[in-house]
């Protein structure tokens, strides 16, 4: 429906308020196109990190599909539609897309920030999305970025999808700067905690999430007072 497909703005970033099915239709079209399309699942963390990055925010406007990675973001935009909130909370689109990659034996390249995250991500595919061809994995750090080497590695593997689980603004900078030279169908930015990993040691994570939400809500209040 038209109402579902409208853009919402949260902390100056336009987000596509799509159902999982609508987002999936877009993603499937991207997989048929020769140019790399950029899908980003924004999280509270990424919105906060991008707060001061005015130039980067402009670049992000050029991404093809920007979806809310958690329900709090939709709530901040006063979205009350239960289906949208539930699908966002359940990561329905991400699961649909990963299932599609597995079913079609797509070639996927993983970007992570640590060895441990790489192992977790790889394990997640082994367990839930068998059939996906993981053709490469790279550890990317903001300190010693080697974009050329990374792009060459990706371009050498006939990649269908680059899955990025990097923190902001590293993730957004990386794709904004290199999308014109990258050979892949889809870049999917998941953010640092993007892959729904089986929860181990959830304590710290939960508390961290709680504080993050509080800070985020304060930021939203401030931006409402400023009138944007």
Locate the predicted segments by residue:
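N-terminal nucleotide/polyanion-binding subdomain common to many enzyme families
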Residues: 2-86
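Short glycine-rich anion-binding loops that position phosphate/pyrophosphate groups of nucleotides
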Residues: 44-47, 166-170, 193
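A short, gly/pro- and small-residue-rich
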Residues: 56-62, 172-194
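Conserved beta-alpha
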Residues: 73-146, 153, 157
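Short gly/pro/ser/thr-enriched loop/turn and capping motifs at secondary-structure boundaries
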Residues: 73-75, 170-171, 193-198
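Short, flexible loop segments at boundaries between secondary-structure elements
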Residues: 140-145, 183-214
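Proline-aspartate-enriched helix->loop->beta-strand connector
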Residues: 154, 158-168, 184
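A charged, well-structured terminal subsegment
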Residues: 214-228
